[in-house]
UniProtKB/Swiss-Prot annotation:
[4Fe-4S] cluster 1 binds at residues 12, 49, 83. Monomer. This is tRNA-2-methylthio-N(6)-dimethylallyladenosine synthase. It comes from Marinomonas sp. (strain MWYL1). Pfam families: Radical_SAM (PF04055), TRAM (PF01938), UPF0004 (PF00919). Its EC number is 2.8.4.3. It catalyses: N(6)-dimethylallyladenosine(37) in tRNA + (sulfur carrier)-SH + AH2 + 2 S-adenosyl-L-methionine = 2-methylsulfanyl-N(6)-dimethylallyladenosine(37) in tRNA + (sulfur carrier)-H + 5'-deoxyadenosine + L-methionine + A + S-adenosyl-L-homocysteine + 2 H(+). It is an enzyme of class 2 (transferase). Belongs to the methylthiotransferase family. MiaB subfamily. Its cofactor is [4Fe-4S] cluster. It is found in: Cytoplasm. [4Fe-4S] cluster 2 binds at residues 156, 160, 163. Its main location: cytoplasm. InterPro entries: Elp3/MiaA/NifB-like_rSAM (IPR006638), Methylthiotransferase (IPR005839), Methylthiotransferase_CS (IPR020612), Methylthiotransferase_N (IPR013848), Methylthiotransferase_N_sf (IPR038135), MiaB_methiolase (IPR006463), rSAM (IPR007197), rSAM_horseshoe (IPR023404).
Length: 451
């Protein structure tokens, strides 16, 4: 009987991608099958994130629950990966002696030998930052569905004062150009229609081609667009300083690149941006966005915001709110500031009271929610092209898909053959976090035109 693998993933899309590759790896090496029930698993993996406050506490709390499973089954193998593993290393095992394997994002390709060692009750830790060798050791991806992530680079070299990523994932290392395209081809052959290119600082990508040239993110986008079966391309996460002219031109000239961009700004106040060492000021960001809007009219924009960074005044927060209105963001990942151990900002006085941080955050989120709702209302009556991902989790009588500008659309339909296909829906109603539509055509129709 096949052994069972359970993976719990915390954090970003990079971690989601890494978890899927862990499953591919152990599926090939040990013929393991994924399960969503930890109690029936032979191997438990916790893929961790250290971006937010109390990340370590969250990890140890989960490991405490898994300890009970280990007591019932001493042969159960428990592994901790991801960014908390990189930060904590062997300290994890000092607090949780039942953990067999500790590995970082760059060493997950060694999981088969780690599992073998754990089977002999040999604990192992490897949180090193080797060159981007893991992709040379991973099997072909196995996917279900029409959308897939593809990691094109690892790490970040920006060293923003609040961020742990350079310390947990290492500095920027780009994956070879042809390695990326090979993975995309493998995904497209399995029916993937939308490719989401990933990197902690994805637009800093500078990868070698087989001809000895250097490719950037725009080159990747144009090459992926030429692969049979791929109809949509997204990328996350970008840095304003790395947003090149060639990438702006990709928005102008590449129709398969979607009309949505996530470009973190963190704050709208120049003194806070300087304290964060973001490498740009407010006006630089505005100018960059205006050029992107000129290249792709109607593009949907989202961003990251940190509220209550050390030194943030009421006036600084007003600057952030004014920037949100000027740019017209319709979504954000926004959080109150919390000190991350080992970062330069952790040496600064966290001088904004928590209740003030939370009040500012609520104001910001209300503003962006209203802007998002206004944009959604403006879409009512329009026909939108969506990629259908599956059934609505709230209503099995509805199918669900995503628009180019990253909005979820639910519509009444009962044909499972539509899943994984493109369709046109007319938007009939707008809600705070989704749209409702009616099907007007799909790839199942003989006269449907993709482009």
């Amino acid at each position: 009987m096949a052994k069972k693998l359970f993976i719990q993933t915390h954090g970003c899309q990079m971690n989601e991608y890494d978890s899927s590759r862990m499953a591919d790896l152990l599926g090939e090496s040990h013929e393991m099958e994924l399960t969503d029930n930890a109690e029936e698993a032979d191997v438990l993996l916790l893929n961790t994130c250290s971006i937010r406050e109390k990340a370590q506490d969250k990890v140890y709390h989960q490991l405490g629950r898994w300890k009970k499973l280990k007591q019932k089954n001493p042969n159960l193998v428990i592994g901790v990966g991801g960014c908390v593993a990189s930060q904590e290393g062997d300290a994890i095992r000092k607090r949780a002696k039942h953990v067999d394997m500790i590995f970082g994002p760059q060493t997950l390709h060694k999981l088969p030998e780690m599992v073998n060692a754990a089977g002999k009750h040999i604990p192992i830790t490897d949180v090193t930052f080797p060159e981007i060798e893991k992709f040379d050791h991973l099997p072909a991806p196995r996917v279900e569905g029409a959308e897939a992530f593809v990691s094109i680079m690892e790490g970040c070299s920006k060293y923003c004062t609040f961020c742990v990523v350079p310390y947990t994932r290492g500095e920027e290392v780009s994956r070879p150009f042809d390695s990326i395209l090979k993975e995309v081809v493998q995904l497209a052959e399995q029916g993937v229609r939308e490719i989401h290119l990933l990197g902690q600082n994805v637009n800093a990508y500078r990868g070698d081609t087989a001809e000895g040239d250097e490719a950037d993110l725009a080159d990747i986008i144009h090459a992926v667009a030429q692969i049979d079966g791929v109809e949509r391309i997204r990328f996350t996460t970008s840095h304003p300083v790395e947003f090149s002219d060639s990438l702006i031109e990709a928005f102008r000239n590449e129709p398969k690149l979607v009309s949505h961009l996530h470009l973190p700004v963190q704050s709208g106040a120049d003194n806070i941006l300087s304290a964060m060492k973001r490498g740009h000021d407010r006006q630089y960001y505005i100018d960059k966005i205006n050029r992107i809007k000129e290249a792709r009219p109607g593009i949907s924009l989202s961003s990251d915001f940190i509220i209550g960074f050390p030194g943030e005044t009421d006036d600084d927060f007003v600057d952030t709110m004014n920037l949100i209105q000027e740019i017209g963001f319709d979504h954000s990942f926004s959080f109150v500031y919390s000190q991350r151990p080992g970062t330069p900002a952790s040496n600064l006085e966290d001088d904004t009271p928590e209740d003030v941080k939370k009040e500012r955050l609520a104001i910001l989120q209300r503003r962006i929610s209203q802007q998002a709702y206004d944009i959604s209302l403006s879409m009512v009556g329009e026909v939108q092209r969506i990629l259908i991902s599956g059934y609505s989790p709230r209503d099995p009588g509805q199918l669900q898909g995503r628009t180019e500008n990253n909005r979820i659309v639910n519509f009444r339909a009962f044909d499972p053959q539509l899943i994984g296909k493109f369709a046109d829906v007319v938007i009939t109603d707008a809600y705070p976090n989704s749209l409702l539509g009616e099907l007007v055509g799909s790839e199942l129709d003989s006269d449907f035109v993709l482009q």
